[in-house]
Amino acid sequence: MEQLCIPERIQSIIGTKAHSVDNVGMSDSQVRIYNEFVLKIQAQSTETNNEAEIARWVGNKLPIPTIIEYCVVNGISYTLMTKIDGEMLCSAEYLEQPKRLIKLVAQGLKKLWKIDVKACPYQTSRLSERLKIAEYNVNNNLVDLSSAEPETFGENGFADSKELLKWLKNNQPEEDIVLTHGDYCLPNIFVKENKISGFIDIGKMGPADRWQDIAIAIRSLKHNFDGKYTGGDKIFDFNPQMLLDELNINFDEQKYKYYILLDELF
């Protein structure tokens, strides 16, 4: 990222306070962790705008960071927010207790689904809007094929991102709308005293099909347990049905496949 010029409104708050840099996760943002707040710096996008707006709409309905300041300078967004208490669900403490971890993932989903989204004015998370963003990403060479699941592209998969986009447009499933996080993976879920204490990285949050979050959660659990994200040995033989049993939901192979493939274009 180019040399940064922290906006005065934010600089006046953080001053010269000490901070660390958070390198957990797969986003291209720079995240600075202070004692009492977090500063996230990244290229401006639909998601950065949505994060500030959806946070105001959600308010105290969910444990999410409070936005202190949001500024955009030269195409770079700066979001200063309160810091969430607790530990990420991808921490060793939880990965070493798989059944407990899976219950907590389900607890977080249920918490999201309890929120009434009928009056939510932000619709960028709906499938029709997500496909528009996906098309923009494809047309502007913003899709990172190296991070895709091995079966998505290649001999038995799609030829390229354009072919995948065409398939997604032609195979849209009916939506069962709930409030979704949008990127419901373990690093974005915090726990304290065995309860969900917060959700972070909410730029994709909004009304969408519940399988948007279920699919990403299953993938995150699978790869955190099999060592792909940690770089270590396999910890646990995860079966998606373990999470679905906690949610009392049957496996929907069509929607699972669809939302995993959709995420490949982001």
What are these regions (language model features)?
Residues 2-11, 111-181:
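An alpha-helical support segment within catalytic cores of ATP-dependent transferases
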Residues 176-180, 192-244, 248-251:
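Active-site Asp-x-Gly
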Residues 20-122:
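ATP-binding pocket architecture of kinase catalytic cores
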Residues 1-28:
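A short alpha-helical cap/connector motif
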Residues 101-105, 157, 210:
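An acidic site on a long C-lobe helix of protein kinase domains
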Residues 187-191:
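Hydrophobic residue at the +6 position relative to the catalytic HRD Asp in the kinase catalytic loop
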Residues 22, 245-266:
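Charged phosphate-binding loop/patch that engages nucleotide di/tri-phosphates or the phosphate backbone
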